[in-house]
């Protein structure tokens, strides 16, 4: 079966990753001891996408957990599903990266990276037909950003024809953990543009807004934010984990979603949104799902899709939904908002469907959009980057680890190019005259 190897790096990556495994294990009926306690054969049919089956009918996540300090790993290990993971797959250092990208990418992380690759290789060799890798990390810190991108480029070298999907938590505009976030994020994006096939952008502020506005939580915790992320991750990977009518895999997703290789940064969303542990009291309808899914308040990255145009969209419906109704609703959204979709990619909205709904819901939908509005997010980081870099503030932390200023300049211009590319395609229109002229030339009578 088409297996995926999951990697989680750094504090953020490990916390999101741990939550993801809780959700997926629950959906597949895997108990905390790795035994199958489910009720439906469908849960086991494609379980090998994420789990290895070991002696005694025990299912073990195909996950590699990486950090440069032992703290977060210890809390994952003592968490509800901690005993599920393979003990050998915990790879950690002792020194920490101290939110310094250079430490994660060049010094501390580089020392640990070979032992991580050994574990990754071992997991990949055990696969029947490896589909690709997914990595959860943040872009604002040291380990997830610096070492995460180092791992991505190393895995890329070794498995050049396998998909690389990243779930990247981007620094948010108002909620900042560290002052050097813009540096770390810019250096990371510089790497992701080249080495990732699809990057799902998530940001804490957007998640915070969803918790506050939509879910009416007065004091959202990181647990609540991570819960939202894990729902989306579960939704994106549904088609891979369950049999459905339209099965997508990471590669099909990329083929449908990435019109130009560098523009692979997606916004994600989910509907219907519910708080952790709450029950759904009313049935949702397909029209409600489609309208909530395209709603700007629903996006998990702080960019407003109304500021740009969609190049491509994918929607994964789950549960007992009528595909006919889905198609009709998706078409009506497109025709009513046609100026928000580029007209030079016809049929740029893809729908897939899986019969099995998530726990506690009758039906749900996961939204993935490749919108030119994502440039807002990069612009914001670039502005903050430039403000500090002009004064060379905090640079000594990076140059002290052997980095060169040149690398900062390169990363900055690569990110500005990315913004310019998004802008260029946002403004691109099909010129009526051009089309007519071409037709005319073809049909011109042969000259005597």
UniProtKB/Swiss-Prot annotation:
It holds the Pfam family Tubulin. The keyword Cytoplasm applies. Mg(2+) binds at residue 69. GO terms for biological process: microtubule-based process. It is found in: Cytoplasm, Cytoskeleton. One of its GO terms (molecular function) is structural constituent of cytoskeleton. Gene3D superfamilies: Helix hairpin bin, Tubulin/FtsZ, C-terminal domain, Tubulin/FtsZ, GTPase domain. One of its GO terms (cellular component) is cytoplasm. Its cofactor is Mg(2+). InterPro entries: Beta-tubulin_BS (IPR013838), Beta_tubulin (IPR002453), Tub_FtsZ_C (IPR008280), Tubulin (IPR000217), Tubulin/FtsZ-like_C (IPR037103), Tubulin/FtsZ_2-layer-sand-dom (IPR018316), Tubulin/FtsZ_GTPase_sf (IPR036525), Tubulin_C (IPR023123). PANTHER family: TUBULIN. Dimer of alpha and beta chains. A typical microtubule is a hollow water-filled tube with an outer diameter of 25 nm and an inner diameter of 15 nM. Alpha-beta heterodimers associate head-to-tail to form protofilaments running lengthwise along the microtubule wall with the beta-tubulin subunit facing the microtubule plus end conferring a structural polarity. Microtubules usually have 13 protofilaments but different protofilament numbers can be found in some organisms and specialized cells. Tubulin is the major constituent of microtubules, a cylinder consisting of laterally associated linear protofilaments composed of alpha- and beta-tubulin heterodimers. Microtubules grow by the addition of GTP-tubulin dimers to the microtubule end, where a stabilizing cap forms. Below the cap, tubulin dimers are in GDP-bound state, owing to GTPase activity of alpha-tubulin. This is Tubulin beta chain. The gene is TUB1.
